[in-house]
Amino acid sequence: MATGRPNNPGSGTLGSASLNAAPGHVPYPRARKNGLPVTTPRVHIATDHAGMELSAHLVSHLTAKGYEVVDHGPKEYDALDDYPSFCINAGLAVVADQKAGVHALGIVLGGSGNGEQIAANKVSGVRAALAWNLSTAKLAREHNDANVVAVGGRQHTVEEATELIEAFLQEPFSNDERHIRRIGKIAVYETTGEIVE
């Protein structure tokens, strides 16, 4: 399990079409083989007690599909566990991998996915999106280059949640200049506190 990794996203020039304008951005290939991107991302997954069954299913399902899955816990059921540490560790691992040039994405699960998304987003360089349908899952990647997806395990069937996760993992970032620019503005505020118009 990856924990305690450095929290230091890359930097770039705001407003340029350079991929470095969005710290932590790793180009997502559009080429596909057997339905998967040519470069399949490493997947970091975390949950709390409310998402444990879904998490176990996803680890097995994604591993069988050829993804390298890193499980950030918990390892056993505890109805009183707290999700922040699990989700923060998954977020830290995604950012560290991306900084090292490894194509990585994250999944955080809970009852609603809301708290897990909030916790993951406290990690500098994480762009966590709550997905509740196929459109939000795909747009999170296509427009926002989200690197973590949050899903509510109590809001969907296992089949529905799996479909959302797969849509997120397989959707490429558009690389459109306007989206890179907007992501860059968020990153500037995150790292400097400056609001760029």
Predicted features, each with a name:
Residues 68-80:
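A short beta-strand-loop structural module common to alpha/beta enzyme folds
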Residues 60-69, 125:
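Short helix-loop-beta junction
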Residues 46-53, 134-197:
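C-terminal binding/interaction regions
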Residues 44-64:
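Glycine-rich phosphate/diphosphate-binding loop of Rossmann-like nucleotide-binding domains
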Residues 86-130:
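Helix-adjacent hinge/juxtasegments
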Residues 2-10, 14:
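Extreme N-terminal basic, low-complexity initiation segments
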Residues 39-43:
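Extreme N-terminal starter segment of soluble prokaryotic enzymes
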